[in-house]
A protein has these predicted regions:
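Walker A/P-loop NTP-binding motif
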Residues: 72-73, 92-107, 127-131
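Generic beta-sheet signal
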Residues: 79-83, 109-111, 215-218, 242-244
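Signature of the SF2 helicase/ATPase Hel1-core->accessory helical subdomain module
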Residues: 95, 101, 122, 126, ...
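Conserved pre-motif I regulatory segment
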Residues: 41-84
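A substrate-engagement module of RecA-like helicase motors
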Residues: 47-49, 54, 107-216, 221-224, ...
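Polybasic (Lys/Arg-rich)
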Residues: 18-52
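Nucleic-acid nuclease catalytic cores
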Residues: 1-23
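Walker A/P-loop
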Residues: 76-98, 110
Length: 307
């Protein structure tokens, strides 16, 4: 039944189906969901079993065992822990290991390893690799910025321009299922490989893939930036037991200032004024006032001191 919201005209189409065809349709519909639920059930069981058998992969250094215990109890009590220690003492493995342990008993749904640099993302990947070598079954994805993973030289998401955007949603489910059932380590190269295979947008596919992964390695922005954060996890209605391992957290202060700060450029006001001066004199006058005010601020900043 369709209703025209303007005229309130109602048009109905009536169809008759026998019970056999309805049952067949329903079973096909459920079968489409069943393979995903089977994946979640089987993967979670295998992951939890591997975690229960997992041991710390090195001999504990001085203070390291205490650090591991502190991280685990912090996760369990849903509190915040700030760790300051010299480079090379094993902070990464000492935080990732207890976070992984918390996944097997329902404390944690997903681990976010947040970084400010590409090189530290590599450290996180290597740490997970060490745990996999020790027997861990744990799927991770490393998220890459859209402009760094796009197949086009200049990304354009218009389906008429990008062949990977054209028909993306018709193919992405199969692409995601393919990659998560065949790869445990999903990074930029893996995403690009499967996006070419299935002709889907690599960036959007990586976000969909993250839903089915145990660990997500990504930039601070994906968690904290109000414009770039992953709405599927942190938007309205997004809810889950997540652990955040914030690498080099002291860098987050400056990044947060940038995320929550806006910038106005004086030259932009001048350009806009010149564009509209022959069309809307009132608007041009307002833009000129803004330009003059910002010029006065600029001159003020040029002074060595202000009284």
């Amino acid at each position: 039944t369709y209703c025209n919201t303007e005229t309130e005209q109602i048009v109905s189409f009536k169809e008759q189906y026998d019970s056999e065809s309805i049952i067949k349709w329903y079973r096909e519909l459920v079968a489409g969901f069943k393979k995903w639920m089977d994946y979640v059930f089987d993967e979670r069981a295998e992951r939890n079993a591997s975690i229960q058998k997992l041991h710390f992969p090195f001999e504990y250094r001085e203070g390291q065992k205490k650090l591991v215990a502190s991280v685990y109890h912090t996760v369990k009590e849903q509190k915040v822990l700030y760790i300051q220690a010299p480079t090379g003492v094993g902070k990464t493995i000492s935080t990732v290991y207890p976070a992984v342990q918390s996944c097997s008993n329902g404390l944690t749904d997903k681990i976010f390893y947040l970084t400010s640099k590409t090189i530290t993302r590599t450290v996180a990947e290597e740490t997970y690799a060490i745990l996999r070598d020790a027997g861990l079954h744990f799927r991770t994805v490393t998220l890459t910025a859209k402009d760094k993973i796009c197949h086009l030289d200049e990304h354009n998401c218009n389906p008429e321009v990008c062949e990977y955007a054209r028909g993306h949603f018709d193919r992405v489910n199969e692409a995601v299922y393919d990659i998560i059932t065949n790869e445990a380590v999903i990074n930029r190269d893996t995403i690009l490989q499967y996006s070419v295979k299935h002709k889907v947008c690599p960036y959007e596919m990586s976000l969909d893939v993250s839903y089915w992964c145990d660990g997500i390695i990504c930039d601070y922005n994906y968690a904290f930036d109000p414009d770039s954060s992953l709405k599927r996890y942190f938007g309205d209605g997004g809810k889950g037991n997540y652990v955040f391992l914030v690498d080099e957290a002291h860098n987050l202060v400056d990044r947060a200032r940038q995320m929550y700060s806006a910038t106005l450029v004086k030259e932009d006001f001048l350009k806009c004024k010149n564009l509209v001066k022959d069309i809307d004199k009132r608007l041009a006058s307002s833009l000129e006032k803004c330009n003059k005010y910002m010029l006065s601020l600029k001159r003020m900043c040029d002074k060595e001191y202000i009284i």
